[in-house]
């Protein structure tokens, strides 16, 4: 029976013609100082070869449309399974991605609000929950008799039919930042005081502005309120102007429509077709919470269904820990005949949610934008998704999954890895955290130094073998009898003797308003 991968002659980056056997169906930790070749072995050899060979089995037509890893610099790799890498720095998701969409918890929640909620009739009355929604039958309002179809889960999605029409489901709108239109009021309009006219509009707009009755040869700060209003908000009137070309003595006459400074930016934004064009415009813009949806991204109709007294957007504002408790109360709140369906939907939600809570993400709300999540938070989302897929025979390469993880949540991380092994997979774990590495079934230590001083295996075996190995650098730290002592710490006011940084902040994401000295 094949029970190990065989790597022969690995020369990726700083690896020194490395030969190593790596157990299959085990948690294999790779330790070592930064730059010792840990990731070169895990990602540059094992993942690169595992993913490349899997893709090589596909047709040429299919492979053309997929990104493939280059062949690793290695003489031979035998018995490597198809590989997936959960990288240290997952890509930053787009503006439409949230914690709820990234974990797919929002799919289950939308299904709850579609199938199990009280829906509003066209006349504003709420109908009690009914199985007619799941049967795709019309609901009949008991108060006014109006017949209507309840919204589907798709109609409650802000990336689809449930999007707010004002912000198109992003939760924010871009408006003109008036403070950027005239950055230096000591300049006159002739000297280029109105910034959008210099970069987004024809220079002729200065001449048109003069025809609108605005003085263009005095400092902008000396203009009257009426003149300033014409610059910022004046009407689109056509004016007859005389102009002189900059590079010649020729002059001419022209009828030209006046574009005020604000409309100049709005017009340019509407015509943006690429990133280069957006960069020219975005310096005049600011982002604000959408006034229509209040940042929820949902249309008014998508916010209408009520389940346990609240709407979908309010459920998405709850932290995951609070939401799990709320979902537990959904089935008992419904009529008896609806509870089997409710239990099924809620169970699929709870299974994923509890895994994320085990990984220490219970403080996040489903409406939190993915772009604001830390690297460690996004990587743990990847981990939870990997376990949910219930694959077998796959090599999972985890690159420092303990980043940002509190010691109290290490148990959840280890539980995820145990589940992957239990499903018949193999796990390669690159990490520095001794608490995580100590749970490995097999440990490979790279070193002894970084760069050209690394790339060799200085110790390998079980954790107990590494602890006994005198050549191991990490062995003493894995032992409970670690003879190494920590640096002496300062106490009291002596810490701030050489000065301090004062930090004061308002509320942002999970941070409450606070003040502290560092």
Regions found by a protein language model. Give the residues of each.
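P-loop/Walker A nucleotide phosphate-binding surfaces of NTP-dependent enzymes
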Residues: 2-372, 378-394, 406, 416, ...
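Conserved beta-strand-loop-alpha-helix hinge in the C-terminal portion
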Residues: 100, 445-479
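Walker B catalytic motif
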Residues: 369, 398-401
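Conserved hydrophobic alpha-helix in the ABC-type ATPase nucleotide-binding domain
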Residues: 412-413
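Conserved catalytic segment of ABC-fold P-loop ATPases
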Residues: 419, 426, 438-445
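H-loop/switch region of ABC-family ATPase nucleotide-binding domains
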Residues: 430-432
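Long, charged amphipathic helices and adjacent flexible linkers at domain junctions
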Residues: 473-503
């Amino acid at each position: 029976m094949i029970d190990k991968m065989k790597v022969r002659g690995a020369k990726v980056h700083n690896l020194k013609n490395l030969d190593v056997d790596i157990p299959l169906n085990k948690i294999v930790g790779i330790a070592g100082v930064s730059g010792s070749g840990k990731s070169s072995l895990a990602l540059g050899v094992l993942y690169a070869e595992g993913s490349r060979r899997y893709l090589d089995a596909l047709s040429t037509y299919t492979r053309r449309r997929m990104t493939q890893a280059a062949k690793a610099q290695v003489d031979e790799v035998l018995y490597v399974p198809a590989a997936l890498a959960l990288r240290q720095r997952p890509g930053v998701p787009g503006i439409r991605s949230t914690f709820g969409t990234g974990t797919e918890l929002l799919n289950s929640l939308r299904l709850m609000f579609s199938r199990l909620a009280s829906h509003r009739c066209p006349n504003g009355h709420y109908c009690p929950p009914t199985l007619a929604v799941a049967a795709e039958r019309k609901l009949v309002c008991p108060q006014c008799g109006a017949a209507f179809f309840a919204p589907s889960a798709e109609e409650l999605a802000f990336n689809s039919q449930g999007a707010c029409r004002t912000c198109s489901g992003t939760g924010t709108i871009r408006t003109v930042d008036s403070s950027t239109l005239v950055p230096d009021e000591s300049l006159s309009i002739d000297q280029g005081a109105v910034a959008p006219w210099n970069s987004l509009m024809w220079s002729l707009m200065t001449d048109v502005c003069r025809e609108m009755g605005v003085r263009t040869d005095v400092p902008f700060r000396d203009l009257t309120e009426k003149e300033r209003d014409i610059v910022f908000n004046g009407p689109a009137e056509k004016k007859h102007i005389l102009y002189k070309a900059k590079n010649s003595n020729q002059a001419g006459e022209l009828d030209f429509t006046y574009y005020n400074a604000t409309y100049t930016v709005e017009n340019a934004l509407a015509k943006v077709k690429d990133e280069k064009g957006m960069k020219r415009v975005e310096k005049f813009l600011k982002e604000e919470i959408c006034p229509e949806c209040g940042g929820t991204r949902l249309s008014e109709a998508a916010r209408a269904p009520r389940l346990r007294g609240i709407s979908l957007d309010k459920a998405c504002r709850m932290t995951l820990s609070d939401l799990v408790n709320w979902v537990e109360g959904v089935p008992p709140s419904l009529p008896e005949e609806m509870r089997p369906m409710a239990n099924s939907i809620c169970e699929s939600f709870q299974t994923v949610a509890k895994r994320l809570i085990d990984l220490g993400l219970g403080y996040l709300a489903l409406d939190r934008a993915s772009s604001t999540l830390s690297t460690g938070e996004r990587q743990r989302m990847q981990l939870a998704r990997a376990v949910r897929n219930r694959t077998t025979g796959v090599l999972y390469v985890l690159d420092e999954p303990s980043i940002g993880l509190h010691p109290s949540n290490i148990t959840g991380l280890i539980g995820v890895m145990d589940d992957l092994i239990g499903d018949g997979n193999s796990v390669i774990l690159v990490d520095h955290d001794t608490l995580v590495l100590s749970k490995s079934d097999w440990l490979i230590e790279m070193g002894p130094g970084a760069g050209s001083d690394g790339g060799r295996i200085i110790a390998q075996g079980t954790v107990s073998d590494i602890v006994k190995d005198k050549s191991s650098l990490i062995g003493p730290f894995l032992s409970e009898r670690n003879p190494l002592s920590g640096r002496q710490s300062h106490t009291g006011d002596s810490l701030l003797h050489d000065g301090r940084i004062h930090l004061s902040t308002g509320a942002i994401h999970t941070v409450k308003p606070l003040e502290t000295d560092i």
